[in-house]
Amino acid sequence: MAGGAHRADRATGEERKEGGGRWRAPHSPSPPGPRGCPVPLKAAAQSLCRKPTWGRYCTLLLFQRKLEIYSVELHAATDIKKKEGRDGKKDNDLELKRNQQKEELKKELDLDDHKLSNKELETKYGTDIIRGLSSTRAAELLAQNGPNALTPPKQTPEIIKFLKQMVGGFSILLWVGAVLCWIAFGIQYVSNPSASLDRVYLGTVLAVVVILTGIFAYYQEAKSTNIMASFCKMIPQQAVVIRDSEKKVIPAEQLVVGDIVEIKGGDQIPADIRLLSAQGCKVDNSSLTGESEPQSRSSGFTHENPLETKNITFYSTTCLEGTATGMVINTGDRTIIGRIASLASGVGNEKTPIAIEIEHFVHIVAGVAVSVGILFFIIAVCMKYHVLDAIIFLIAIIVANVPEGLLATVTVALSLTAKRVAKKNCLVKNLEAVETLGSTSIICSDKTGTLTQNRMTVAHLWFDNQIFVADTSEDNLNQGFDQSSGTWTSLSKIIALCNRAEFKPGEESVPIMKRVVVGDASETALLKFSEVILGDVMEIRKRNHKVVEIPFNSTNKFQLSIHQTEDPNDKRFLLVMKGAPERILEKCSTIMINGKEQPLDKSMAQAFHTAYMELGGLGERVLGFCHFYLPADEFPETYSFDSESMNFPTSNLCFVGLLSMIDPPRSTVPDAVTKCRSAGIKVIMVTGDHPITAKAIAKSVGIISANSETVEDIAKRCNIAVEQVNKRDAKAAVVTGMELKDMSPEQLDELLANYPEIVFARTSPQQKLIIVEGCQRQDAVVAVTGDGVNDSPALKKADIGVAMGITGSDAAKNAADMILLDDNFSSIVTGVEEGRLIFDNLKKTIAYTLTKNIAELCPFLIYIILGLPLPIGTITLLFIDLGTDIIPSIALAYEKAESDIMNRKPRHKKKDRLVNQQLAVYSYLHIGLMQALGAFLVYFTVYAQQGFRPTSLFHLRIAWDSDHLNDLEDNYGQEWTSYQRQYLEWTGYTAFFVGIMVQQIADLIIRKTRKNSIFKQGLFRNKVIWVGIASQIIVALLLSYGLGSITALNFTMLKAQYWFVAVPHAILIWVYDEMRKLFIRLYPGSWWDKNMYY
């Protein structure tokens, strides 16, 4: 019944030109003509198989509400992996060939089974409707076409994933360094078996570092990406089939084309089925189409479009009620759900913005490291250094430039943020998705279940010639309309009695709006509405016993029942009816006003039509209600009612009122949309629902602002034709899937660029992908929200897919990068804020990490060029990168936002880089050089205290490193043996290490903010920073005093006074950075701001 009311309302809505507010592309081509040459589905599939270099990218044009679309489209749109030609001409030829192959694969699949008679179906599929297939024939078809199952995609072996972590990022450089160390030791060992093991230690440490960070990264980022698995879970396990004239229960995957199957309420549809008979059958296509309204099914051909006709049911959808018998016409990958599954798995995992930024950063740092290393390798060779020594210098320079612990730190920071947002009901499957959400500039949101509550709710009532507003909040408890009228008493009774829905037993203690109901969406809404206002509806029905009923059907478009009344003094039967408003009104001759019947004259009929059009224009589903007390003399208590012959009156009834329902928006969504708008994020609605409904919901949640108008709105207000309106005057657009199909990519780009507020209605999965790709062509970072199977391809294609955790299908959850555990769109706003914060904090982490690179690099450059004793060893550097700096780097992930980041525009993924020029210059050439000077100050102090003045150290390297010189004099005439010099050198290592560590404490504190003063931000708001500082000091103390005796580590016990030599430099760094921030705040937009703000 409700489905019929919806269809009646939809029909009237489509006739109203102004209702949809649709956007029309300039110079849109005329509707498509006759179909191209149809090819069988099997042939199309085989054409794909003949091109093994093509990954399948099957797209499905679903549920277009226009007569011109008669078929399902199959497209191929993935890369061809062939060897590239060596010259540009070959590349161009290859690209041309790719495009030609794509065009060849754009074939339409002719589906005409819904038009065929039963006899023609039997002939086409070689079966018998009564006896079914023979077991022998079924076995042949199963062997020929394969099982009724979705083909899982090829999986990357876990070992390959692990090995990629072992050689990705900086790892390959460190592996090369480790191997060179071992080779250098091997060459040296051949000529000198007593050679030092330092190079072995260094190579081993580098290898261990790579392995540990690789294992950590593999563990942190491992996730399931098998989209097909979720689809397979949706497959029914068993199916009732007729074979050899016998009814059998077989595994659903053994079904073949031509099988005769039976389905009943509660079953999942086991394949694409052409119905042969149906009794009260309704199906739920919401997981496929996004529409929550049950769809009635029958055996009759009702629409040219096979996706619109009522005599086809689709694989994996659910039969809600009734029974049906049908013939299998498609199985497995050839079903509609199979094509969507292929589409979802065919869409490649796009690199996230933060992954691109990290890759960009790795390329920069690796390029600098290798370039500088090779340059100084050449310099060392030219300066007569031994080649093996020059190789070690090369390795040392690379190690000094590469922040070995940074990628692990980034992963930990992302993990911590993911845990933080999980507490706010956002489950992150892909760690990088946290930052991606923060950089989002467009959110393409599904309507049903995402912006709305995914449940039909009574929104308005019309009785006594007035429209009343009902409470559509989650609890429905604040019904403020007038309930004292006698008309309401009659209307409420009809609503309660003319309803087949029932609460599931045992739900009495559950809040009414959360109870499970057996019945379709509209009936459920009416039942809960009645229960809230009237109390126990089941008890009311018991007191008003039902004697006969006519369920809704598409022919009558009404539901009728006759009841005994609870009044013992009134022996009359009560006839109650509801259905499509215009059909109900036709059956009435009177109307109830203020509890009394009066003639239904032209003025009241006009009032009815005005109210009906107003409610329909809001995108709401409207039902009409009427009743009639049967005369006791004509219909005594013993009267035998017959629903078949309808031996009771169905005309001259009394019209009581209208009631409209809508899937209402979530209460928190309008505020979330407002926050998105203030954050510079465009929210686009993409739904499969009717444009009038979509527009109404968009206006109610703020996607279309109150003062924004579509072209149609302007035309209506100015009373002119739509073609006369300047499209630039409209701020909003409502575009149907049919209009979108006729748009070129350029027209779609124009639409997305020119309209800040857009709603796409009646879209297919293919079109959702087209919309996402169009947004990405605008250089936007696109987030897509959704909960249905139909959303999964777009969820996977988007920069970040956000699925609903409660109502979301398994397919949507597996395709998504993030899951909203509370299904609350407003949780996305929390995710955006956390994403922006983590990007800011990653900037601070990288700036903090890069700063010390100059201080680590300079010792080797000075050593090579000026011949000083080596200020710091390579292994010692690793203890800075992986020892003292790891926890402080992670601590920056806990830093609070320093300003209102939600009033900032989204970052441009190509311009606003994680590592920009300002960050590199300030970290390397400002703070980095200060750190290097401070560390050298500690180094020279240690040597001076031991008798070597700074000037005497220059060009001392050759004598210093000689193993045979045991009487080297210092500036005070003291003689130093080779071992004593080695121990002093290790003390210098330790001093240089401590000098960097002390200044890194200051560097850590200044990185708390990029613009605000430290004092405004608060020194102690982030307590984890102080844990990081404590860890730096503890690790340094442990290395110096606890592990100083271990020769391989090259540390010694450092005197206490040396720990404080670099403190003045640390203070200078703090003061310098505070001055930088002060000038940025004082002179926004100035040269200083542009060059010193990173």
From Swiss-Prot:
Signal peptide: none annotated. GO terms for biological process: intracellular potassium ion homeostasis; intracellular sodium ion homeostasis; potassium ion import across plasma membrane; sodium ion export across plasma membrane. Residues 1-21 have a biased composition (Basic and acidic residues). Residues 1-37, 286-305 are annotated as: Disordered. The modification Phosphoserine is found at residue 1013. It is a multi-pass membrane protein. Found in the skin, kidney, distal colon and brain. In the kidney it is found in the connecting tubule, cortical collecting duct and outer medullary collecting duct while in the brain it is specific to choroid plexus and cortex. Its main location: membrane. It catalyses: K(+)(out) + ATP + H2O + H(+)(in) = K(+)(in) + ADP + phosphate + 2 H(+)(out); K(+)(out) + Na(+)(in) + ATP + H2O = K(+)(in) + Na(+)(out) + ADP + phosphate + H(+). Residues 179-201, 379-390, 863-872, 937-988, 1042-1056 are lumenal. Belongs to the cation transport ATPase (P-type) (TC 3.A.3) family. Type IIC subfamily. The catalytic subunit of a H(+)/K(+) ATPase and/or Na(+)/K(+) ATPase pump which transports K(+) ions in exchange for Na(+) and/or H(+) ions across the apical membrane of epithelial cells. Uses ATP as an energy source to pump K(+) ions into the cell while transporting Na(+) and/or H(+) ions to the extracellular compartment. Involved in the maintenance of electrolyte homeostasis through K(+) ion absorption in kidney and colon. In the airway epithelium, may play a primary role in mucus acidification regulating its viscosity and clearance. This is Potassium-transporting ATPase alpha chain 2.
